[in-house]
Swiss-Prot record:
Chief location of this protein within or outside the cell: membrane
This protein's UniProt keywords: ATP-binding, Cell inner membrane, Cell membrane, Ion transport, Iron, Iron transport, Membrane, Nucleotide-binding, Translocase, Transport
Stated name of the protein: Fe(3+) ions import ATP-binding protein FbpC
Gene symbol of the encoding locus: fbpC
Subcellular compartments: Cell inner membrane
Binding site for ATP: 41-48
Subunit structure: The complex is composed of two ATP-binding proteins (FbpC), two transmembrane proteins (FbpB) and a solute-binding protein (FbpA).
Catalytic activity as recorded in UniProt: Fe(3+)(out) + ATP + H2O = Fe(3+)(in) + ADP + phosphate + H(+)
Pfam assignment, any one: TOBE_2
PANTHER family noted in UniProt: SPERMIDINE/PUTRESCINE IMPORT ATP-BINDING PROTEIN POTA, THIAMINE IMPORT ATP-BINDING PROTEIN THIQ
Transmembrane segments: none
Lipid bilayer topology: Peripheral membrane protein
Length: 353
């Protein structure tokens, strides 16, 4: 294999219709070379349609798609400089790992010996050197996934597309393989567009996350940006659970905001806060509970569940039920206990109205 040639991706005002249904209304986005960008969202948000448009498996109703600065809008899939790792891996069960990786090369016109050499190099890249003789059935789910990645990479695409690549793995293996994918992408420096509905997966592997909703972009940013500075209540709750309550921003300067919640003032990170009515997103682990209510932000324990290293509470308040995670397992609060709710310094985000 020669050096990886990471390419950029650009969607310019792309609309995709299926009959009378508009799946993507005027979508514009960019992916910088050498980055891993995740399209994240609920089912039906448009992320898979976006990936299929990029792969050439669908064509836009209007707009332009560019890969590496080249307009590929009307090019068929086989003429685009991309490779795709499918959800099912799509390995041939009767072929060895080496033969699976070499197959695409031979189909692209490489001589058999050269294809095998490049396939062996590809398997080494993904940590499967010496395992080329094994059939897919003789490999673990994670190893099969790496064979699929190797098969895509040996074609030296400008962009690697990954469509829900971990969905067929169990939870423990998912964590390990997502780490391997991220390490491989950072080591080789290829551009990747990754589709998933799993927020933890997106947070773990991405340089940039694009959260999609109803065919548009709800928010784009780094994993930290989306988690710590959500642009809306939807993003706050989608990127890890959040309790959203009304508040008033009294002032915001020098990176700190003074807010009023339930009659009490608090100081929290300002980020992009503007004075006036707002909402406060509260992560479940961003508060402490004290077993005595005394005005201010308080509530009553409506439900509790012991989960080993933490206790989950539902606290009934004037703003509805709050979901709270408390690591203090040694002092469980009984049901109907009145509690005061105190904010920590992290895990709070102001959402402007």
């Amino acid at each position: 294999m020669t050096a990886i040639r990471p390419g950029s991706v650009t969607f310019e005002n792309v609309t995709k219709k299926f009959g009378n249904f508009t799946a993507l209304p005027n979508l514009s986005l960019t992916v910088e070379p050498g980055t891993l960008v995740t399209l994240l969202g609920l089912s039906g948000c448009g992320k898979t349609t976006t990936l299929r448009l990029l792969a050439g498996l669908e064509h836009p109703t209007s707009g332009r798609i560019l890969i590496g600065g080249k307009d590929v809008t009307n090019l068929p899939a086989n003429e685009r400089d991309v490779s795709m790792v499918f959800q099912s891996y799509a390995l041939f069960p009767h072929m060895t790992s080496l033969e699976n990786v070499a197959y695409g090369l031979e189909s692209s016109g490489f001589k058999k010996n050269e294809a095998r050499e490049r396939a062996e190099e590809g398997l080494k890249l993904v940590g499967l050197g010496g395992m080329g003789h094994r059939l897919p059935a003789e490999l673990s789910g994670g190893q099969q996934q790496r064979v699929a990645v190797a098969r895509a990479l040996v074609l030296e695409p400008q962009v690697l597309l990954l469509d829900e690549p971990l969905s067929n793995l169990d939870a423990r293996l998912r964590r390990r393989v997502r780490t391997e994918i991220r390490e491989l992408q950072q080591r080789l420096g290829f551009t990747a567009v990754y589709v998933t509905h799993d927020q933890d997966e997106a947070l773990a592997v991405s340089d940039t996350i694009i959260v999609m909703k109803e065919g548009g972009i709800a928010q784009k940013g780094s994993p930290r940006d989306l988690y710590e500075a959500p642009a809306s209540a939807f993003i706050a709750d989608f990127m890890g659970e959040a309790n959203v309550v009304p508040c008033e921003v009294i002032s915001a300067e020098n990176g700190e905001a003074v807010i009023r919640v339930a009659g009490l003032t608090h100081r929290v990170p300002a980020r992009n806060a503007q004075p006036g009515p707002a909402q406060l997103a509260i992560r479940p682990n961003a508060v402490t509970l004290q077993p005595q209510a005394g005005g201010g932000f308080s509530g009553t324990v409506a439900h509790s569940a012991y989960l080993g290293d933490h206790i989950e509470y539902e606290i009934e308040t004037e703003h509805g039920k709050l979901f709270i995670v408390d690591p203090a397992v040694e002092q469980s609060l009984p049901l109907q206990t009145d509690v005061s709710i105190q904010f920590k310094t992290r895990g709070l985000a102001i959402i402007n109205q």
